[in-house]
Amino acid sequence: MSEIPGDLKFLKSHEWARVEGNGRVTVGISDHAQGLLGDLVYVELPEVGADAKAGEQIAVVESVKAASDVYSPISGKVVEVNSALSDKPETINEDAYGEGWMFVVELTNAEEVNELLDPDAYAEALENDDH
């Protein structure tokens, strides 16, 4: 498993959130998740302007093996999407925590970030996972 960046927060469902410091949060799926899914062939991103609600499905990633819902780790308005993923969904496989980001949300409740798992807690959740 690759190194988990220390500046990220996570959901147990393998989404990550990076607080950008300007009230915005970049979201993607973890390296662990892309590894389980295998080669991604399709990404369905939210629309810019869509309302994101913490813990609710907002996007879909599809691989040759399975389709998987992506849940928003925080609530807010989607202000940017990584449209490059439409043509190159495999970018998530190649760089899950960098170029493979999925969308950016403008936070409505900064407290929600504190409810997410830190990298150590996420690593522990992975160890206890039955996968």
UniProtKB/Swiss-Prot annotation:
Binds 1 lipoyl cofactor covalently. GO terms for cellular component: cytosol; glycine cleavage complex. It comes from the Bacteria. The keyword ATP-binding does not apply. InterPro entries: Biotin_lipoyl, GCV_H, GCV_H/Fam206, GCV_H_sub, Single_hybrid_motif. Residues 24-106 form the Lipoyl-binding domain. Its cofactor is (R)-lipoate. The modification N6-lipoyllysine is found at residue 65. Belongs to the GcvH family. HAMAP family: GcvH. This is Glycine cleavage system H protein.
